[in-house]
Swiss-Prot record:
Cofactor (UniProt): Zn(2+)
Coiled-coil annotated spans: none
Any one GO MF annotation of this record: rRNA binding
Keyword set, alphabetical order: Metal-binding, Ribonucleoprotein, Ribosomal protein, RNA-binding, rRNA-binding, Zinc
PROSITE patterns noted in UniProt: RIBOSOMAL_L31
Function: Binds the 23S rRNA.
Residues engaged in binding Zn(2+): 16, 18, 36, 39
Protein name (record): Large ribosomal subunit protein bL31
Top-rank taxon, per record: Bacteria
């Protein structure tokens, strides 16, 4: 195998927009993310309501055949 062809790994601090942070290994020393396991609805069990009724009405209004 060839030597010195792989990127150098350093300890990386990953920070989420919710304030959660954790350590990982990466080529960069710092990363910022928008969503993590502490604030993602799948992991927290909370649901986010989506206004699908408004979208359906808008679709029907746009493509209504008179």
């Amino acid at each position: 195998m060839k030597k010195d062809i792989h990127p150098k790994l350093v300890e990386c601090t990953v920070t989420c927009s919710c304030g959660n942070s954790f350590k990982n290994e990466s080529q960069k020393s710092e990363m910022r993310i928008d969503i993590c396991n502490e604030c993602h609805p799948f992991f927290t069990g909370s649901e986010r309501m989506v206004d699908t009724a408004g979208r359906i009405d808008k679709f029907k209004k746009r493509y209504a055949q008179n």
